[in-house]
């Protein structure tokens, strides 16, 4: 049995001269055949992969800093790492700070909803992400759209294996995943299975109770 550790840094955080707790944790961990460790810098540290120009990369970088743009890419990257490395009986640990904490939560939610795709199904990751992020409201009931949870159940049994995270260590979760229009008006988007994390064996969340933010 191995440990697979996922470390997701916060908004604007990457390796520097004043590193976050996520980088320090990554640095402190042993990396061996029995423990595989992954680190991803936070949103807003680089432009979108699909941005073709320097201006586009700069613009998407600022969107990441302000509004969390790039969060989905970070979730998909961590998920892809798990696909390549996970073996039955491995224990999965996820850590994250700020929007990286929400990335960690969302990864746990994606695993609960869609399972972990078997190797060779990398092309299905965008579909799984799209299904996971799809916002359901009363519009769907009116149009007779099948529930994404109904679709996900069949998708999971067809393409995936179960992968239940053992531990989630979080600092100051910040969620910012946008808005969508429903019959009742504009509603804040959310991703399923990210609130209570009942699918994770152990959850620890450290919160700065006295922190002051401008928004």
Task: Label the model's feature ranges.
Residues 1-215:
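Alpha-helical segment proximal to the catalytic Tyr-Lys
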């Amino acid at each position: 049995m191995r440990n697979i550790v996922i470390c997701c840094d916060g908004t604007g955080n990457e390796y520097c001269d004043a590193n976050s707790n996520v980088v320090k944790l990554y640095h402190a961990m042993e990396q061996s055949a029995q423990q595989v460790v992954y680190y991803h810098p936070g949103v807003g540290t680089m432009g979108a992969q699909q941005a073709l120009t320097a201006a586009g990369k700069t613009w998407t970088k600022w969107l990441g800093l302000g509004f969390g743009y790039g969060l989905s890419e970070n979730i998909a990257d961590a998920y892809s790492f798990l696909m390549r490395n996970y073996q039955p009986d491995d224990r999965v640990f996820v850590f994250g700070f700020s929007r990286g904490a929400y990335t960690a939560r969302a990864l746990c939610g994606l695993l609960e909803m869609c399972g972990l795709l078997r190797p060779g199904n990398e092309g299905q990751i965008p579909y799984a992400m799209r299904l996971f992020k799809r916002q359901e409201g009363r519009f769907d009931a009116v149009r007779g759209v099948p529930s994404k949870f109904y679709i996900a159940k069949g998708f999971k049994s067809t393409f995936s294996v179960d992968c239940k995270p053992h531990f989630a260590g979080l600092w100051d979760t910040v969620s910012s995943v946008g808005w969508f229009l429903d019959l009742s008006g504009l509603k804040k988007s959310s991703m399923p299975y990210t609130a209570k994390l009942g699918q994770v064996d152990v959850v620890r969340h450290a919160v700065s109770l006295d922190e002051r933010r401008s928004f």
